[in-house]
C-alpha cells in the first residue's frame, strides 16, 4: 500500500512495540486506519457481541477512544467497554470500566505483610477522588497475565486469597473479575503461549464461596458499581484496630457492612451496629456493640434485607 494509506508505523519494516513480535504498531495518526478500526469493531457488534475489552488501552491515543467509542454507543446502545488500563481520562467519554491495577498490587502486598489495612483505606479515598463517580473499576485477585507470570492467587496471597477475593466483590466502585479456575480453587499457572487445557470442572467449597459472593453482590444495591453503589464509610473511625478493614456501604435502602482481618494475627473490635444481625456466610446471629475476635485473614459480612445462605468450607 502507499505511504498515505499504510496503517502501520514503519522504519523500513513495521515497528514492533516491546517484544511483541506478532503485533505491528498501528499508525493512529492515519485517519483511514482509525476508520478501519471502527469498522472492524462494528463488524463484531453487528454479530451480537456485548462489547470489547481493549488490550493495553493506555498505549492507544486517548483521543482515538474518545472519537470512536461514543459513536459506537449511539449505534449500539448498551455495549460494555472495558479498558485494560487505569488512566482517569479513559472514562472521559470513552470506557465504562478500567482495570484497578494499583489495587491488585496493593492486595498482594497486604497478603505478604508489606502493606496494611490503613494503606487500603488510603487507596479507596485516592481512587474515588481520581476517578469519575460513574466509573466501574475492575477488581481482581488473578487474571491471565498475573496467573501465568506472577503466580496463582495462592502463590501470591496464601491464606489471604479468599478475603482478598471478598474485597474485590465489596469495595466501592468495584466490578469483580473471576479468572478461569478460580471458581474451583484451581492452583495452577496456565502456560501463556502453549495449549494448557482447563481440567474437568468440579463443584467444591470454592465454587460455593464464589456463588455466595455473586449472590451477595447481586442482591444488595449498596454493592453496585459506579454511581449506583454506596461509597465507603468507616463506622469505627480512629478506633479501627490495625489490621482491620471495616467499612459500610449504603444505597437504595440497603446497607452492607464488611469486617475483614487483613493481617496474620487475630484482631478484636466492637461490632458497629445496634440490635442483632445475621452474618451472611454462616447465618450466625451477632449482637451490635459486642466484642468480637476475627482470626487471621477471616471476615464477617452483614447484609441488610438479604436471606441468609450457607456454604461449605473449601
Language-model features and meaning:
Residues 1-8, 310-314:
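Short, small-residue-biased leader/transition segments that mark boundaries at the very start
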Residues 13-37:
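Chitinase-like catalytic core of GlcNAc-active glycosidases
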Residues 30-44, 161-165:
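Short, acidic/polar
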Residues 40-42, 50-140, 167-170, 185-215, ...:
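Active-site-proximal helices and loops of the catalytic beta/alpha 8
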Residues 133-156:
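Active-site clefts of carbohydrate-active enzymes
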Residues 179, 187-256:
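Glycan-recognition and catalytic regions of carbohydrate-active enzymes
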Residues 262-274:
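Surface-exposed beta-strand/loop patches in extracellular or lumenal glycoproteins
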Residues 288-308, 312:
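C-terminal beta-strand-rich structural cap/linker in extracellular carbohydrate-active enzymes
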Amino acid at each position: 500500500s502507499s505511504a498515505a494509506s499504510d496503517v502501520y508505523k514503519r522504519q523500513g519494516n513495521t515497528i514492533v512495540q516491546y517484544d511483541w513480535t506478532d503485533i505491528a504498531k498501528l499508525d493512529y495518526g492515519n485517519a483511514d486506519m482509525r476508520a478501519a478500526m471502527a469498522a472492524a469493531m462494528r463488524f463484531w457488534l453487528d454479530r451480537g457481541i456485548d462489547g470489547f475489552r481493549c488490550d493495553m488501552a493506555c498505549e492507544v491515543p486517548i483521543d482515538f477512544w474518545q472519537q470512536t467509542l461514543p459513536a459506537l454507543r449511539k449505534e449500539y446502545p448498551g455495549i460494555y467497554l472495558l479498558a485494560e488500563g487505569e488512566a482517569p481520562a479513559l472514562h472521559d467519554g470513552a470506557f465504562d470500566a478500567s482495570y484497578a491495577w494499583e489495587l491488585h498490587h496493593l492486595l498482594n502486598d497486604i497478603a505478604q505483610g508489606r502493606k496494611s489495612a490503613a494503606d487500603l483505606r488510603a487507596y479507596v479515598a485516592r481512587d474515588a477522588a481520581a476517578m469519575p463517580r460513574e466509573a466501574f473499576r475492575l477488581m481482581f485477585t488473578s487474571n491471565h497475565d498475573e496467573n501465568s507470570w506472577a503466580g496463582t492467587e495462592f502463590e501470591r496471597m496464601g491464606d489471604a486469597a479468599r478475603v482478598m477475593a471478598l474485597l474485590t466483590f465489596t469495595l466501592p466502585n468495584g466490578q469483580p473479575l473471576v479468572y478461569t479456575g478460580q471458581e474451583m480453587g484451581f492452583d495452577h499457572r496456565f502456560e501463556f503461549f502453549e495449549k494448557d487445557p482447563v481440567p474437568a470442572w468440579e463443584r467444591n467449597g470454592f465454587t460455593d464461596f464464589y456463588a455466595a459472593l455473586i449472590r451477595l453482590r447481586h442482591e444488595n444495591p449498596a454493592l453496585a458499581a459506579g454511581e449506583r453503589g454506596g461509597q465507603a464509610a468507616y463506622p469505627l473511625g480512629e478506633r479501627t484496630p490495625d489490621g482491620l478493614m471495616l467499612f459500610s456501604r449504603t444505597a437504595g435502602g440497603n446497607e452492607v457492612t464488611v469486617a475483614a482481618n487483613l493481617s496474620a494475627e487475630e484482631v478484636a473490635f466492637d461490632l458497629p451496629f445496634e440490635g442483632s444481625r445475621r452474618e451472611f456466610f454462616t447465618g450466625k446471629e451477632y449482637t451490635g456493640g459486642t466484642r468480637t475476635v476475627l482470626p487471621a485473614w477471616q471476615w464477617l459480612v452483614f447484609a441488610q434485607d438479604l436471606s441468609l445462605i450457607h456454604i461449605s468450607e473449601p
